[in-house]
Amino acid sequence: MSEVIKFKKETKKEYVVDNQIRGRSYSSNHAKLLKHMDRLIDLQQGKRPRPVMFHMSPCNPCNLTCSFCCFANRAMKEMLTVEQMKSAIDQFTALGVTGMEFTGGGEPTLHPNLDEIIEYGYNKGLKMGICTNGSKLRKIKNWHMMSWVRLGMYSFDEKKPYEYHLDVFDGLDIEISAAYVWDGAMDTSTNPNITGEWLDDHAKKLATNEYKEENFMKMLAWVEEKKIPCRIAFNAIKDPKIVQQDIETIKVLIGKHEEKHGKLEYAFLSDFNFKGERRNNHCYMHGVKPCVFTDGNVYVCPSAELAPENLYQVNDEFKLCDIEGITDFYNSQVGGADVFRRHHDCSFCKYAYQNELIDDVLMPTKHNEFA
């Protein structure tokens, strides 16, 4: 496992800075996007977009039912074929994409052919990561081909907790991180996994996870003991005022833990991507991190369903093309901002700061000999 960087945390101000630095290493944000200046220059010059990475949702089945699931209205049995996944990999690598992330939909390790796809992507030269709830780690054999794994710290809130079999990573050069989602105010939740009001209730069941202070403290103790960086997030599919309340609750809980055990070294609050209001409806994420979903289509990003109005599912307005049309779609995006820019009015955009950064890159300005 890669060595984890430790930061000094002698003052609250220093801790906040360190928290932000670590957070920007383990999540999508504009600081990371700035590491890909070649992509931004291509967009500025009207060249064909070359996404930095792409997400792939191999399957929709999941062995958990979480209260915060942003795909609660998905078709539960849907999954990509081996041929579809290989075709997407072929086309994106031909476009110059170098990174791939397996994610949900459902729990990616439940796809029966995931090992085959990991090996295929590895042999194509892709750097690959995976977001998993961590309950089926022993099911996968090709962990040595992965660059990183992000474990969902959801066991701690389940009525029947499960074990994270970290021994599968022994001796491997793979970065292990974690993610936790705090979901307060469940009594006002609109998530179908809480209300039972799915668009289609086939194969659906109600959430069983519970949010208690003691569970949260156990989770913090675990990631600190295991020395695993853990981003602590919140359920964003709510009224922004309630989201802010959840953020404040997380801060209080972290404060209680630190009063007893000292400053956290590995867990950190991931609130720097939360932006209450967007500058405009401009969207460029298909040029950064498009998502191949289980229905065989490619979408603008993996997170449009985080906006409450999108009803916990992927919607047609965010569709770019089907898998076989990836190359043709990106070849059609040459010509600058007026060709490439999309307009989506998501009330919550996880990538609002990145979109604003690209907006600024594309903004025409005079006297550019000066800065």
Predicted regions and their residues:
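Radical SAM/AdoMet-radical enzyme domain recognition
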Residues: 71, 79-103, 107-235
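Short acidic, glycine/proline-enriched helix-loop-strand junctions
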Residues: 52-57, 111-113, 117, 121-126, ...
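Short beta-strand segments
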Residues: 57, 101, 131-132, 180, ...
